[in-house]
Design a protein with these regions (language model features):
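GH16 jelly-roll
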Residues: 1-157
Length: 157
């Protein structure tokens, strides 16, 4: 039952390849265990990548009134497919903002004073727990390539 609240969190990972794969490194509010529902509990996506967009790095926050397809998202393109090498995915998080990094380079920062958040809750001032997962298929990655018979999300220590 490990929780994180603020600081710098970095994960070295190599995402899966293959159309239909969905690699994700994310945080979910620990108050979910107390009955607070999503998205009110908050979600911080450190990285999402689908095999159908092998160059794409996506970092997002979800909260009340800005969740799912309406999450606050920044998408950038890597210079080569993310499945070719290990990369360092990170966030720097404090009571007022969250900043995303790829290999030490900042690519997005969202603060609770962001115009898109005016009048909306900022559920990121609590403990969160880490989820590292690989999914196959679903609404986000789309249809699965029939040739995709093996997928792996790798990490290093």
């Amino acid at each position: 039952d490990i929780g994180f609240k603020y600081g710098y969190l970095e994960i070295r990972a190599k995402v899966s390849e293959g159309v239909g794969s969905w690699s994700a490194l994310w945080l979910l509010g620990k108050n979910l265990a107390d009955g607070v529902t999503w998205p009110a509990c908050g979600e911080i996506d450190i990285l999402e990548n689908t095999g159908s967009h092998p160059f794409q790095i996506q970092g997002t926050i979800h909260g009340p009134d800005y969740s799912g397809e309406n999450g606050l998202t920044k998408i950038i393109q890597a210079q080569k497919p993310l499945s070719e090498d290990f990369n360092n995915y990170a966030i720097s998080w404090n009571e007022n903002s969250i900043e995303w990094f790829i290999n030490g380079v900042s690519y997005n920062k969202i603060s609770k004073t962001d115009p898109a958040l005016v009048g909306k809750d900022w559920p990121f001032n609590q403990e969160f727990y880490l989820i590292i997962n690989l999914a196959i298929g679903g609404w986000f990655p789309g249809e699965v390539d029939p040739e995709l018979v093996q997928a792996e999300l790798q990490g290093t220590g």
